[in-house]
């Protein structure tokens, strides 16, 4: 049985898949299984998986009908046999010491998960280190409640909390099983937000390797994060409803402010996507978002602090549902991301 199971969900990733898998094959820690989950790809990804498997016996392939990223990751969780589990997206890469470094920390501190920073790589721009809004080091339950719970879901400045991407993490398999932590397959975008909030809430301890950008996030043209998603708002609302069900009446901490900030954040994200639509379609899309009752309550209840001036203007337009002004504003501003 391998020490680490690495789950790689794949959908039409032929351009980048070999680069990703080669970075896994090159890991300095060798006792891993590489689970390639082909989520109904229609390009040459499945053939590429077969060729890569011939190069390394640690590769296992699972073909399934297309069900989305969460479905593919869940299939990987069911197939995984390692004591620890990691996730790597098919268009990303990891440094050679990624799993060796994370494993050393999770075993040293006997924690539920460990995570590091990522390097963002984008064509035409210098690589940038992305760090979490936490000090590095070991976090027990008391420290998690004090330092993480106040920003677990969303920060006051409308930025994500410190626990977001599952790809920078190594999880103890027994921890995931004990708390039945899986990905919600009804949430199609920002899947990590829901999973990571639950993991952070349930964890007895974790370790954060601050300043070590061992995961390499490649922002590729045409990826899911760079294109307009017509159903994004409905998916964001489903995620918000799931978070409310889990955290609205939490006995250990009052997450109500963060839940309001969460729907405001994703309304901004959905409105940013409206910029990509023809002008004739923008008004109806904006009206549908701004007239959402949960969003209206959140804008009334929770003044947002420490945000850029341009975003503050947008929030005022949203709060008073100034659709014509919102249309004009969206035509002039950069996408919120």
Annotate each predicted stretch with a short phrase:
Residues 85:
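Short aromatic/hydrophobic "clamp" motif used to bind/position activated sugar donors
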Residues 204, 211-220, 226-253, 266-269, ...:
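Catalytic core of nucleotide-sugar-dependent glycosyltransferases
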Residues 12-26:
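Short, well-formed alpha-helical segments that are part of the catalytic scaffolds
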Residues 69, 90-231:
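Donor-binding/catalytic cores of nucleotide-activated saccharide
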Residues 23, 38-47, 65, 89:
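A conserved acidic beta->alpha catalytic loop
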């Amino acid at each position: 049985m391998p020490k680490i199971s690495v789950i790689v969900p794949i959908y039409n990733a032929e351009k980048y898949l070999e680069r990703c898998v080669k970075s896994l094959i090159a890991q300095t820690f060798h006792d891993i299984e590489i689970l390639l989950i082909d989520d109904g790809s229609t390009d040459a990804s499945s053939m590429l998986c077969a060729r890569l498997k011939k190069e390394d016996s640690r590769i296992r392939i699972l073909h399934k009908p297309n069900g989305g990223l969460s479905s593919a990751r869940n299939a990987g969780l069911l197939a995984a046999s390692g004591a620890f589990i990691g996730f790597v997206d098919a268009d990303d890469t990891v440094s050679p010491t990624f799993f060796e470094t994370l494993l050393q920390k999770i075993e040293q501190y006997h924690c539920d998960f460990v995570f590091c920073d990522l390097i963002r790589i984008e064509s035409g721009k210098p690589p940038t280190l992305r760090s979490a809004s936490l000090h590095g080091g070991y976090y027990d339950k008391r420290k998690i409640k004090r330092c993480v719970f106040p920003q677990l879901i969303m920060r006051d400045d409308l930025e994500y909390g410190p626990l977001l991407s599952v790809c920078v993490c190594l999880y103890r398999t027994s921890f995931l099983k004990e708390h039945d932590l899986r990905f919600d397959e009804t949430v199609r975008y920002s899947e990590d937000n829901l999973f990571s909030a639950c993991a952070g809430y349930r964890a007895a301890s974790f370790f954060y390797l601050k300043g070590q950008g061992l995961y390499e996030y490649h922002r590729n043209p045409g990826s899911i994060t760079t294109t307009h998603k017509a159903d994004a708002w409905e998916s964001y609302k489903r995620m918000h409803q799931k978070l409310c069900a889990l955290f609205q009446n939490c006995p250990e901490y009052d997450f109500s402010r963060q839940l309001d900030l969460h729907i405001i954040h994703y309304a901004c994200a959905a409105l940013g996507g409206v910029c990509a639509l023809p002008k004739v379609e923008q008004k109806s899309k904006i009206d549908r978002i701004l007239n959402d009752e949960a969003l209206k309550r959140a804008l009334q209840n929770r003044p947002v602090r420490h945000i850029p001036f341009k975003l503050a203007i947008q929030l005022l337009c949203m709060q008073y549902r100034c659709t014509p002004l919102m249309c004009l504003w969206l035509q002039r501003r950069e996408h919120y991301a």
